[in-house]
Amino acid sequence: MEFKISGYTRLVGLLGYPVRHSLSPLMHNMAFQHLGLDYVYLVFEVKEDNLKEAVDAMKTLDVAGFNVTMPNKQKIIPLLDEISEEARLIGSVNTVVNKNGHLKGYNTDGKGYVMGLADEGISPEGKTIVIAGAGGASKSVAIQLALEGAKEITILNRTVEAAEEICNIINKNIPTCKTSATGYEDNELKQQLKEADLFINCTNLGMGSHEEKSIISSTDILHPDLIVSDVVYAPPKTKLLHMAEEVGCKTINGLGMIIGQGALAFKLWTGEDMPIEYIKRIILSK
Protein backbone atom coordinates (compact mmCIF):
# COMPACT_ATOMS: atom_id res chain seq x y z
CA MET A 1 0.00 0.00 0.00
CA GLU A 2 1.31 3.47 -0.92
CA PHE A 3 2.49 5.57 2.00
CA LYS A 4 1.20 9.16 1.87
CA ILE A 5 1.52 12.17 4.15
CA SER A 6 -1.49 14.50 4.12
CA GLY A 7 -2.83 17.47 6.04
CA TYR A 8 -4.71 14.98 8.22
CA THR A 9 -1.74 12.75 9.08
CA ARG A 10 -1.38 12.18 12.85
CA LEU A 11 2.07 12.38 14.37
CA VAL A 12 3.56 9.99 16.91
CA GLY A 13 7.20 9.71 17.83
CA LEU A 14 10.00 8.97 20.25
CA LEU A 15 11.61 11.35 22.75
CA GLY A 16 15.05 10.37 24.03
CA TYR A 17 18.78 10.51 23.45
CA PRO A 18 20.31 8.89 21.50
CA VAL A 19 17.43 7.57 19.37
CA ARG A 20 18.62 7.54 15.73
CA HIS A 21 19.34 3.80 16.01
CA SER A 22 15.82 2.90 17.20
CA LEU A 23 13.76 0.16 15.54
CA SER A 24 10.54 1.99 16.43
CA PRO A 25 10.21 4.14 13.27
CA LEU A 26 10.56 1.07 11.04
CA MET A 27 8.16 -0.97 13.14
CA HIS A 28 5.40 1.63 13.46
CA ASN A 29 5.61 3.18 9.99
CA MET A 30 5.50 -0.21 8.28
CA ALA A 31 2.49 -1.14 10.44
CA PHE A 32 0.72 2.14 9.60
CA GLN A 33 1.38 1.57 5.90
CA HIS A 34 0.27 -2.07 6.04
CA LEU A 35 -3.05 -1.16 7.70
CA GLY A 36 -3.62 2.03 5.70
CA LEU A 37 -3.56 4.24 8.80
CA ASP A 38 -2.84 7.96 8.35
CA TYR A 39 -0.07 8.23 10.94
CA VAL A 40 3.68 8.82 10.81
CA TYR A 41 6.33 7.99 13.44
CA LEU A 42 9.42 10.19 13.85
CA VAL A 43 12.27 10.32 16.36
CA PHE A 44 13.21 13.44 18.31
CA GLU A 45 16.55 13.69 20.10
CA VAL A 46 15.47 15.14 23.43
CA LYS A 47 17.65 15.27 26.54
CA GLU A 48 16.57 15.89 30.13
CA ASP A 49 17.30 19.62 30.01
CA ASN A 50 14.76 20.29 27.23
CA LEU A 51 12.21 17.59 28.03
CA LYS A 52 9.57 20.00 29.36
CA GLU A 53 9.74 22.12 26.21
CA ALA A 54 9.44 18.98 24.06
CA VAL A 55 6.39 17.73 26.00
CA ASP A 56 4.75 21.17 25.74
CA ALA A 57 5.41 21.06 21.99
CA MET A 58 3.77 17.64 21.73
CA LYS A 59 0.63 19.12 23.31
CA THR A 60 0.72 22.24 21.13
CA LEU A 61 1.12 20.17 17.97
CA ASP A 62 -1.71 17.85 19.08
CA VAL A 63 0.27 14.68 18.46
CA ALA A 64 -1.60 11.41 19.01
CA GLY A 65 1.07 10.30 21.45
CA PHE A 66 4.72 9.41 21.77
CA ASN A 67 7.20 6.93 23.17
CA VAL A 68 9.76 7.89 25.78
CA THR A 69 13.17 6.33 26.23
CA MET A 70 16.34 7.03 28.18
CA PRO A 71 17.19 9.40 29.75
CA ASN A 72 13.59 10.60 30.08
CA LYS A 73 11.50 7.65 31.32
CA GLN A 74 11.43 8.78 34.94
CA LYS A 75 11.82 12.53 34.40
CA ILE A 76 8.67 12.74 32.29
CA ILE A 77 6.29 11.59 35.04
CA PRO A 78 5.82 15.01 36.72
CA LEU A 79 5.05 16.51 33.29
CA LEU A 80 2.07 14.19 32.70
CA ASP A 81 -1.53 14.56 33.82
CA GLU A 82 -1.99 10.89 34.71
CA ILE A 83 -0.10 7.59 34.72
CA SER A 84 -1.30 3.98 34.63
CA GLU A 85 -1.03 1.59 37.56
CA GLU A 86 1.88 -0.38 36.11
CA ALA A 87 3.74 2.87 35.34
CA ARG A 88 3.24 3.93 38.96
CA LEU A 89 4.63 0.65 40.29
CA ILE A 90 7.55 0.57 37.87
CA GLY A 91 8.28 4.27 38.31
CA SER A 92 8.84 4.97 34.64
CA VAL A 93 6.87 5.70 31.47
CA ASN A 94 7.65 4.61 27.92
CA THR A 95 4.38 5.50 26.16
CA VAL A 96 2.21 8.61 26.33
CA VAL A 97 -1.28 9.12 24.89
CA ASN A 98 -2.55 12.63 24.17
CA LYS A 99 -6.32 13.07 24.40
CA ASN A 100 -7.27 16.71 23.85
CA GLY A 101 -4.20 17.92 25.72
CA HIS A 102 -4.54 15.40 28.56
CA LEU A 103 -1.36 13.33 28.69
CA LYS A 104 -1.53 9.84 30.18
CA GLY A 105 1.61 7.77 30.62
CA TYR A 106 1.93 4.00 30.42
CA ASN A 107 4.73 1.48 30.73
CA THR A 108 4.40 -1.24 28.08
CA ASP A 109 7.87 -2.78 28.57
CA GLY A 110 6.84 -5.45 31.06
CA LYS A 111 3.62 -6.26 29.23
CA GLY A 112 5.61 -6.44 26.00
CA TYR A 113 7.89 -9.03 27.59
CA VAL A 114 4.87 -11.08 28.70
CA MET A 115 3.49 -10.86 25.14
CA GLY A 116 6.78 -12.27 23.87
CA LEU A 117 6.45 -15.20 26.28
CA ALA A 118 2.85 -15.78 25.18
CA ASP A 119 3.99 -15.98 21.54
CA GLU A 120 6.15 -18.91 22.64
CA GLY A 121 3.24 -20.54 24.47
CA ILE A 122 4.54 -19.62 27.93
CA SER A 123 2.55 -18.12 30.79
CA PRO A 124 4.27 -16.71 33.90
CA GLU A 125 1.42 -17.89 36.13
CA GLY A 126 2.69 -20.18 38.88
CA LYS A 127 6.27 -20.01 37.62
CA THR A 128 9.46 -19.78 39.66
CA ILE A 129 11.59 -17.15 37.95
CA VAL A 130 15.19 -15.99 38.31
CA ILE A 131 16.21 -12.60 36.89
CA ALA A 132 19.78 -11.35 36.42
CA GLY A 133 20.13 -7.59 36.72
CA ALA A 134 18.23 -4.89 38.57
CA GLY A 135 18.04 -1.99 36.12
CA GLY A 136 15.03 -0.53 34.33
CA ALA A 137 14.35 -3.58 32.17
CA SER A 138 14.50 -5.90 35.17
CA LYS A 139 12.14 -3.70 37.17
CA SER A 140 9.54 -3.56 34.38
CA VAL A 141 9.76 -7.28 33.68
CA ALA A 142 9.75 -8.41 37.32
CA ILE A 143 6.77 -6.27 38.33
CA GLN A 144 4.73 -7.31 35.31
CA LEU A 145 5.53 -11.00 35.86
CA ALA A 146 4.34 -10.63 39.46
CA LEU A 147 1.14 -8.93 38.26
CA GLU A 148 0.64 -11.82 35.81
CA GLY A 149 0.73 -14.44 38.58
CA ALA A 150 4.35 -15.53 38.94
CA LYS A 151 4.76 -17.67 42.06
CA GLU A 152 8.29 -16.68 43.02
CA ILE A 153 10.87 -14.23 41.66
CA THR A 154 14.54 -14.06 42.65
CA ILE A 155 16.58 -11.09 41.44
CA LEU A 156 20.37 -11.34 41.37
CA ASN A 157 22.49 -8.23 41.05
CA ARG A 158 26.01 -7.22 41.98
CA THR A 159 24.50 -4.33 43.95
CA VAL A 160 22.01 -6.17 46.14
CA GLU A 161 20.29 -2.95 47.24
CA ALA A 162 19.00 -2.32 43.70
CA ALA A 163 17.49 -5.82 43.59
CA GLU A 164 15.99 -5.35 47.05
CA GLU A 165 14.28 -2.14 45.92
CA ILE A 166 12.39 -4.04 43.20
CA CYS A 167 11.51 -6.86 45.59
CA ASN A 168 10.16 -4.37 48.13
CA ILE A 169 7.82 -2.86 45.54
CA ILE A 170 6.47 -6.31 44.64
CA ASN A 171 6.16 -7.42 48.28
CA LYS A 172 4.22 -4.28 49.17
CA ASN A 173 1.89 -4.19 46.17
CA ILE A 174 1.67 -7.79 44.90
CA PRO A 175 1.98 -10.02 48.00
CA THR A 176 0.85 -13.14 46.08
CA CYS A 177 4.34 -13.30 44.56
CA LYS A 178 7.23 -14.28 46.81
CA THR A 179 10.42 -12.36 46.05
CA SER A 180 14.03 -12.40 47.16
CA ALA A 181 17.18 -10.46 46.28
CA THR A 182 20.73 -11.71 46.34
CA GLY A 183 24.20 -10.85 45.11
CA TYR A 184 25.41 -12.19 41.81
CA GLU A 185 27.74 -15.17 42.13
CA ASP A 186 27.89 -18.39 40.10
CA ASN A 187 27.26 -20.62 43.11
CA GLU A 188 24.25 -18.56 44.16
CA LEU A 189 22.85 -18.57 40.62
CA LYS A 190 23.32 -22.33 40.30
CA GLN A 191 21.41 -22.86 43.53
CA GLN A 192 18.55 -20.59 42.45
CA LEU A 193 18.26 -22.17 39.00
CA LYS A 194 17.82 -25.71 40.36
CA GLU A 195 14.13 -25.07 41.08
CA ALA A 196 13.53 -22.37 38.46
CA ASP A 197 11.22 -22.60 35.46
CA LEU A 198 12.45 -19.43 33.74
CA PHE A 199 15.79 -17.58 33.76
CA ILE A 200 15.89 -14.05 32.33
CA ASN A 201 18.96 -11.98 31.51
CA CYS A 202 18.07 -8.31 32.01
CA THR A 203 21.67 -7.06 31.82
CA ASN A 204 23.53 -5.71 28.78
CA LEU A 205 25.87 -8.71 28.64
CA GLY A 206 25.58 -10.17 25.16
CA MET A 207 25.04 -6.94 23.24
CA GLY A 208 27.22 -4.19 21.76
CA SER A 209 30.72 -4.11 23.21
CA HIS A 210 29.69 -6.98 25.53
CA GLU A 211 28.57 -9.27 22.69
CA GLU A 212 31.14 -11.96 23.49
CA LYS A 213 30.16 -12.07 27.16
CA SER A 214 27.56 -14.15 28.97
CA ILE A 215 25.88 -13.72 32.32
CA ILE A 216 26.87 -17.33 33.09
CA SER A 217 30.41 -18.68 33.06
CA SER A 218 29.50 -22.33 32.50
CA THR A 219 26.61 -24.42 31.17
CA ASP A 220 26.87 -26.55 34.32
CA ILE A 221 24.45 -24.28 36.15
CA LEU A 222 21.66 -24.83 33.59
CA HIS A 223 19.27 -27.77 33.24
CA PRO A 224 17.29 -28.91 30.16
CA ASP A 225 13.86 -28.10 31.66
CA LEU A 226 14.83 -24.46 32.16
CA ILE A 227 13.52 -21.76 29.80
CA VAL A 228 16.28 -19.22 29.16
CA SER A 229 15.29 -15.75 28.01
CA ASP A 230 17.31 -12.67 27.09
CA VAL A 231 15.94 -9.14 26.76
CA VAL A 232 18.72 -8.46 24.22
CA TYR A 233 17.42 -8.65 20.62
CA ALA A 234 20.60 -7.72 18.71
CA PRO A 235 22.29 -10.07 18.14
CA PRO A 236 19.28 -12.40 17.77
CA LYS A 237 21.15 -15.12 19.63
CA THR A 238 23.41 -14.00 22.47
CA LYS A 239 26.22 -16.07 23.91
CA LEU A 240 23.91 -16.96 26.82
CA LEU A 241 21.29 -18.36 24.44
CA HIS A 242 23.92 -20.33 22.53
CA MET A 243 25.12 -21.85 25.81
CA ALA A 244 21.55 -22.65 26.87
CA GLU A 245 20.83 -24.42 23.58
CA GLU A 246 23.86 -26.65 24.15
CA VAL A 247 22.14 -27.92 27.31
CA GLY A 248 18.79 -28.39 25.56
CA CYS A 249 16.99 -25.41 27.09
CA LYS A 250 14.20 -23.63 25.27
CA THR A 251 15.52 -20.14 24.45
CA ILE A 252 13.78 -16.82 23.76
CA ASN A 253 15.48 -13.61 22.61
CA GLY A 254 14.36 -10.02 23.18
CA LEU A 255 12.65 -9.47 19.83
CA GLY A 256 9.25 -10.49 21.19
CA MET A 257 9.57 -7.90 23.97
CA ILE A 258 10.55 -5.05 21.65
CA ILE A 259 7.70 -5.84 19.25
CA GLY A 260 5.26 -6.46 22.09
CA GLN A 261 5.88 -3.13 23.81
CA GLY A 262 5.55 -1.41 20.44
CA ALA A 263 2.32 -3.24 19.62
CA LEU A 264 0.80 -2.14 22.92
CA ALA A 265 1.73 1.50 22.25
CA PHE A 266 0.35 1.17 18.70
CA LYS A 267 -2.99 -0.03 20.11
CA LEU A 268 -3.13 2.81 22.64
CA TRP A 269 -2.60 5.42 19.91
CA THR A 270 -4.65 3.99 17.05
CA GLY A 271 -7.11 1.54 18.60
CA GLU A 272 -5.87 -1.03 16.06
CA ASP A 273 -3.84 -4.22 16.50
CA MET A 274 -0.33 -4.09 15.11
CA PRO A 275 0.26 -6.80 12.45
CA ILE A 276 2.87 -8.48 14.62
CA GLU A 277 3.86 -11.38 12.35
CA TYR A 278 4.28 -9.00 9.41
CA ILE A 279 6.45 -6.64 11.47
CA LYS A 280 8.50 -9.53 12.82
CA ARG A 281 9.28 -10.68 9.27
CA ILE A 282 10.38 -7.18 8.27
CA ILE A 283 12.67 -6.75 11.27
CA LEU A 284 14.23 -10.19 10.79
CA SER A 285 14.91 -9.39 7.12
CA LYS A 286 16.94 -6.26 8.00
Curated annotation (Swiss-Prot):
Shikimate binds at S22, L23, S24, T69, N94, D109, Y233. Belongs to the shikimate dehydrogenase family. Disulfide bonds: none annotated. Involved in the biosynthesis of the chorismate, which leads to the biosynthesis of aromatic amino acids. Catalyzes the reversible NADPH linked reduction of 3-dehydroshikimate (DHSA) to yield shikimate (SA). It catalyses: shikimate + NADP(+) = 3-dehydroshikimate + NADPH + H(+). This is Shikimate dehydrogenase (NADP(+)). Keywords: Amino-acid biosynthesis, Aromatic amino acid biosynthesis, NADP, Oxidoreductase. GO terms for molecular function: NADP binding; shikimate 3-dehydrogenase (NADP+) activity. Homodimer. The keyword Amino-acid biosynthesis applies. The active site is at K73 (proton acceptor). CDD domains: NAD_bind_Shikimate_DH. It comes from Alkaliphilus metalliredigens (strain QYMF). Pathway: Metabolic intermediate biosynthesis; chorismate biosynthesis; chorismate from D-erythrose 4-phosphate and phosphoenolpyruvate: step 4/7. NADP(+) binds at E85, G133, A134, G135, G136, A137, V231, G254. Its EC number is 1.1.1.25. It holds the Pfam family Shikimate_dh_N. Gene3D superfamilies: Leucine Dehydrogenase, chain A, domain 1, NAD(P)-binding Rossmann-like Domain. SUPFAM superfamilies: Aminoacid dehydrogenase-like, N-terminal domain, NAD(P)-binding Rossmann-fold domains. PANTHER family: BIFUNCTIONAL 3-DEHYDROQUINATE DEHYDRATASE_SHIKIMATE DEHYDROGENASE, CHLOROPLASTIC (PTHR21089:SF1), SHIKIMATE DEHYDROGENASE (PTHR21089). One of its GO terms (biological process) is shikimate metabolic process.
